[in-house]
């Protein structure tokens, strides 16, 4: 049984002791990282969240403390009191490496079984074991460092937005289900049998209502929930930095959030972000990078070849161009020597994105090697090489298709794939931000034969494009903007519709009947009858921001208690079966 503190107080954290503390008397508390018995001396590395301190016990210093120290094992929780002295052998790898604590008394606050995972940095353990014993995994210094960064980031966000006169307002966790996009997590109501709350996918409607309420500037660091199939860096519950502003246009929102990004990165990790951040229209992002999340850390941009091939007699390209399709290419520098098998693998890769194949031209010193060279004239080959600005040793990779989206997406993904394969991003700690703007307001779902909102139904169209809502909705651009960092979406937002008639028109374009629109969003439409201000906002993915600030590529590392890939918690075993009594109270019967 562990000993009680009985009034004993910790005077300093283990990791805070330095040379200036020599000759001071201190009490430290923490966990045993390691113990070494050298006969008449016992050395214990004691660890707390601030670091590791070496504690030395000697028979001649205090025999009782020495004998008790000999009984401790890894991860025992201790309180040790003694004098800070200079170490004989300095450990330059530790901030506390100049000093040690000479143990005069020791309390074993609790004992520990042999841990199923070793508490160290760079742990090589199966993810499910780490998640099952998460409380041990979180003792590791690298995990504690990440969660400290998370705390510092949240504080920096609050400090900045407070200076900008934003108010932090909490919005409901139990709200109305408005099924659009991802599935809602539903919560049955005991008071209203057969009815359900939904956990919010975002506070979108409430923050707009706060603008109608006259709060002017709102923010919240808030939990959101989506019951969707999990990808590598998705979690069923995640955190957003959510904000909204009244009486603003797009430039105002972008300016505010650029300064927020600059403040956070400088104050949390000391990195300077140059402003203003580059802006790129959606169409340019897609045509040059094949993605609405362009990674600007390397080149290999997509080039369109339609103009140089418009007169070609090569049947494959000619049919595509004549039928309104497109031909585009990327250039892999110094890859002309790539083997046929490697190139064939690249062809298989683009086929996973619906491309029909991959043509290629290797520009070698003594020849131009290509399976399509015999179908092209010398002038066409030269025009392609000139258009791609290819040098001797470069490899040109070409995709053609009737659908521009297939060409853009397949080359965009191939571009990213090659960057990894060629090591273009290795040891690259550059931060390349870009705003992507002028998104399409809606896109056409061919399977369901209807228009869908690209962001959400409350995004305002660009003023000059409103005229196309009735005749050509696909032509309408949105007042939407995403902030992208190194090819990852860090956040997104828009200027909102604040006019009831325009909002009703938007619902009409999306195929909502008036009755359906009022059933789902009547409270918002009703609020818009009472003088709503122009407003807009943005939400950052807080977890993803922490990934960039801490340098980890796994979202589970930035969340204290995450779920696994199957949305299951190995530690608590949630979700779990509940009692029949609880289900009966809710009027729920489980279908077998």
From Swiss-Prot:
Residues annotated to bind ATP: 226-228, 235, 489, 541-544
Family stated for the protein in its record: Belongs to the class-II aminoacyl-tRNA synthetase family. Type 1 subfamily.
Reactions performed catalytically: tRNA(Asp) + L-aspartate + ATP = L-aspartyl-tRNA(Asp) + AMP + diphosphate
Positions with a binding annotation for L-aspartate: 180, 226, 455, 496
Listed EC numbers: 6.1.1.12
UniProt GO MF annotations: aspartate-tRNA ligase activity; ATP binding; catalytic activity, acting on a protein; nucleic acid binding; transferase activity
Role noted for this protein: Catalyzes the attachment of L-aspartate to tRNA(Asp) in a two-step reaction: L-aspartate is first activated by ATP to form Asp-AMP and then transferred to the acceptor end of tRNA(Asp).
Keyword ATP-binding: yes
Keywords: Aminoacyl-tRNA synthetase, ATP-binding, Cytoplasm, Ligase, Nucleotide-binding, Protein biosynthesis
Region (Aspartate): 204-207
Subcellular location(s) per record: Cytoplasm
Source organism (scientific name): Clostridium tetani (strain Massachusetts / E88)
Gene Ontology BP terms: aspartyl-tRNA aminoacylation
Gene Ontology cellular-component terms listed: cytoplasm
Gene3D superfamilies in the record: Bira Bifunctional Protein, Domain 2, GAD-like domain, Nucleic acid-binding proteins
The UniProt record lists the keyword Nucleotide-binding: yes
InterPro entries per record: Aa-tRNA-synt_II, aa-tRNA-synth_II, aa-tRNA-synth_II/BPL/LPL, Asp-tRNA-ligase_1, Asp-tRNA-ligase_1_N, Asp/Asn-tRNA-synth_IIb, AspRS_core, GAD-like_sf
Enzyme class: ligase
Name of protein: Aspartate--tRNA ligase
Annotated HAMAP family: Asp_tRNA_synth_type1
Assembly: Homodimer.
CDD domains: AspRS_core (cd00777), EcAspRS_like_N (cd04317)
